[in-house]
Amino acid sequence: MTTVDATAGESGRPVAEEAPAAPVVGPMAGDPSIWGLASFIAGSVALGLALVGVVPFGVLGAPLAIILAATALGLLLSTIWAAAVGQSAVAAVFGIFGTFWLSYAVLVLGLDHNWFAIPVLAAVATVRLFLLTWLIIIVLLTLATLRLPSAFTAVFALVSLALLLLLLAWEQTSPLGVPSSSLLKAGGWVVLVFAAVGVYLFFSAAQAGTGGKALPLGPALMK
């Protein structure tokens, strides 16, 4: 749209100027990270508490209701929102974590109900495969996003550390297939730490989304 300047130009004709664009509202606007981060925090807290012993040891399905219905679903919907508003990096991060949480739920349910016809003796190797695959993916994500503020890098690095500890726990299984409880608990505490960093990121996004000033997120490690 254009508006007509009240003053005339050198030719004596009105001068057309660009009017400021109207703010975009509706589903094609906003910050999807507010919802995405809240979803991420919910699943992280549930998994971390389960790993440190809030529920009986070995009850892997305890956090699944939150992980599947809140975290995985929330992150995947946030991915669509981010892609719709052109935030490709945010969409990639939420998409990666959304599919991670979804695949965790499928893994636990699949092993418990024998969906994939995996022999009992191969169940431990299947869990190791899952953890190693996602460790590689999250390490790659960490390295590929070093231009993001360092608070995001800290989350990705802590997720990688948690996956490494859980992988080591399953590498040290007993003859009965029981993983190392101490390493599982260590991994659980790391999960709670990256959930806490996620809370900080959520507050930053919420502050900005409600008209305030975003919290400092630290300098990027790569310019």
Regions found by a protein language model. Give the residues of each.
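C-terminal ends of transmembrane helices
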Residues: L75-V85, V139-R147, A205
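Structural signature of hydrophobic alpha-helical transmembrane segments
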Residues: G58-A72, V120-T133, F156, G188-L192
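Short, highly charged, low-complexity non-transmembrane loops/tails of multi-pass membrane proteins
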Residues: G212-K223
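C-terminal halves and exits of single transmembrane alpha-helices
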Residues: G98-V124
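Juxtamembrane loop-transmembrane helix junctions in multi-pass integral membrane proteins
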Residues: V24-D31, V55-A62, A84-S88, I118-A125, ...
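Membrane helical hairpin/interfacial module
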Residues: L75-W101, V106
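Alpha-helical membrane segments in multi-pass integral membrane proteins
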Residues: V127-L140, S150-S174, S180-S204
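N-terminal topogenic module of multi-pass integral membrane proteins
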Residues: M1-A82, S88
